[in-house]
Amino acid sequence: MAVSKVYARSVYDSRGNPTVEVELTTEKGVFRSIVPSGASTGVHEALEMRDEDKSKWMGKGVMNAVNNVNNVIAAAFVKANLDVKDQKAVDDFLLSLDGTANKSKLGANAILGVSMAAARAAAAEKNVPLYQHLADLSKSKTSPYVLPVPFLNVLNGGSHAGGALALQEFMIAPTGAKTFAEAMRIGSEVYHNLKSLTKKRYGASAGNVGDEGGVAPNIQTAEEALDLIVDAIKAAGHDGKVKIGLDCASSEFFKDGKYDLDFKNPESDKSKWLTGVELADMYHSLMKRYPIVSIEDPFAEDDWEAWSHFFKTAGIQIVADDLTVTNPARIATAIEKKAADALLLKVNQIGTLSESIKAAQDSFAANWGVMVSHRSGETEDTFIADLVVGLRTGQIKTGAPARSERLAKLNQLLRIEEELGDKAVYAGENFHHGDKL
């Protein structure tokens, strides 16, 4: 079915920063998508185009990307008369219009908006839910469909918070639930208990939440944070049903070849900085004491040696985010160096749906897991909820069970589970290999 109109506008994300919304019109209606935005902009990522005009939006405007959709992509896209059901053709067309390796001519935020809107239009044309269309595109098995374990970011440290705590995200994963709906209830109950305990121990303002909905108390060490979470799990009555995931974001505290766990202190003691081996030992001691099942970015993005050393003995899921930035060449290197065994998939890091699907397929082929992820600057768009079901990855990271831009995805997964009924299973303990269920 032909596309009669492509139109973009600037809207706002959950941090109050501009982002790109694209509308694509066919005979079936108007199909919309909003692009998320990350705080990180790694050198190996597709380029998120910002206007850099400091007199407006602190330089973060997206009018250039919006104009690229309206003045460059729109007319060419309509004229090309593409079949929106052929996502590869749509994305190849967008890539050829851009012509750069990192999408810097048109902007990954312009290209991705069109790519996602096209997928929504295609699902409508086929009269199927978006997740089913995405399963068709990725040639995923659909009997049964797999609902993911939500890795809920309930406590923040690192650059996302005050306090000395170096590690960035502490997540709870209700793997012991029987359904996604039960997982959400467990997650919600643990979250509320965590907020109460945090206020009790650190004062009322410690219950305030960060960009992704997690609490950010003035905590000094990882042990202190983990004790708080374990106490909240017990207080909620869900001991044994809830595991823990970490996102260390350790590129943030990598200095001169070592890791500074006191990086927020300008006077930090250099004699206490850790080598990669010493940091690995610290992770091992945490894994012995706490029910940790997944660690993301345990080392800096180019410290390959430390990644490979740790992976040999970790025995739990090791997720590559900064290491791979959803970039096929980086993923291939990580697979070859045996540095990790799971990919964090962020569609806007690579910039088209087809490339995102391929990144997941390459990872599955290497026996890796795939965790679909939001970004810190999110919107009400729920695309990744359908994507995680369509790709059958078994795990999603989309913030805390709080803040509407996070709940939008989690609520969409509740709807999908309800709609699928007995045609779906919850990944539970098998989150690492949802693709094999």
Swiss-Prot record:
Q: Which GO terms describe its cellular component?
A: cytoplasmic side of plasma membrane; cytosol; fungal-type vacuole; mitochondrion; phosphopyruvate hydratase complex; plasma membrane
Which InterPro entries does UniProt cross-reference here?
Enolase (IPR000941), Enolase-like_C_sf (IPR036849), Enolase-like_N (IPR029017), Enolase_C (IPR020810), Enolase_CS (IPR020809), Enolase_N (IPR020811)
Modified positions (Phosphothreonine) in chain numbering = 313, 324
What GO biological process terms does the UniProt entry carry, in alphabetical order? glycolytic process; regulation of vacuole fusion, non-autophagic
**UniProt cross-references to Gene3D superfamilies, sorted A to Z:** Enolase-like C-terminal domain (3.20.20.120), Enolase-like, N-terminal domain (3.30.390.10)
Entry-linked Pfam families: Enolase_C, Enolase_N
Write down how the cofactor binds this protein. Mg(2+) is required for catalysis and for stabilizing the dimer.
Query: Which key words are in the record?
Result: Cytoplasm, Glycolysis, Isopeptide bond, Lyase, Magnesium, Metal-binding, Phosphoprotein, Ubl conjugation
EC nos:
4.2.1.11
In chain numbering, cross-link Glycyl lysine isopeptide (Lys-Gly) (interchain with G-Cter in ubiquitin) is at 60, 243, 358
First-listed, main subcellular location of the protein, grouped into a coarse class: cytoplasm
Could you tell me what reaction this enzyme catalyses?
A: (2R)-2-phosphoglycerate = phosphoenolpyruvate + H2O
Cofactors required: Mg(2+)
Superkingdom classification of source: Eukaryota
Which residues take part in binding Mg(2+)?
Answer: 247, 296, 321
Quote the pathway field. Answer: Carbohydrate degradation; glycolysis; pyruvate from D-glyceraldehyde 3-phosphate: step 4/5
HAMAP family for the chain: Enolase
- Similarity annotation: Belongs to the enolase family.
Other notes: Present with 2610 molecules/cell in log phase SD medium.
Output this protein's name.
Enolase 2
Tell me which species this is from: Saccharomyces cerevisiae (strain ATCC 204508 / S288c) (Baker's yeast)
Q: Which gene encodes it?
A: ENO2
